[in-house]
Amino acid sequence: VPGVTEAGSNSNNAVNLLDIYPTLTELAGIPSNPAVEGNSLAAMLRDPSVRKSEPTLITHGFQNHALRDQRWRYIRYADGSEELYDHKNDPNEFTNLAGKKKPAEQITRLKRFLPEVNADPLRASRKRGKNKKP
């Protein structure tokens, strides 16, 4: 971003498209609608070493969620099964650590960020055979 970001800088933070609107409103100096989800990335644009305080949420289909922070990816499927990957030691996600004793605290920590409410998939998507409710 001209005038904000140093040329050639980058950040390894996982971000979400929901963060774009609050970022643009902050950079433009206009109020953001509080009903809109997302967090401004302006601080990260100014200083790429800034770390996000919360993991990024990714949802695919109905009740299938993944959470990603600097080191970990936690996945929870609609059927209740789980996956956990340590990107520091396993960047290609070959070893699922869910169910192992040592990283259990990471699952507990990341689970706090799962959505409490899941909206029904769009009816049009269900008609095409996608996003079927279990």
Question: How would you label these PLM feature ranges?
Answer:
Residues N92-K102:
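Active-site-proximal N-terminal segment of extracellular/periplasmic enzymes that hydrolyze or transfer
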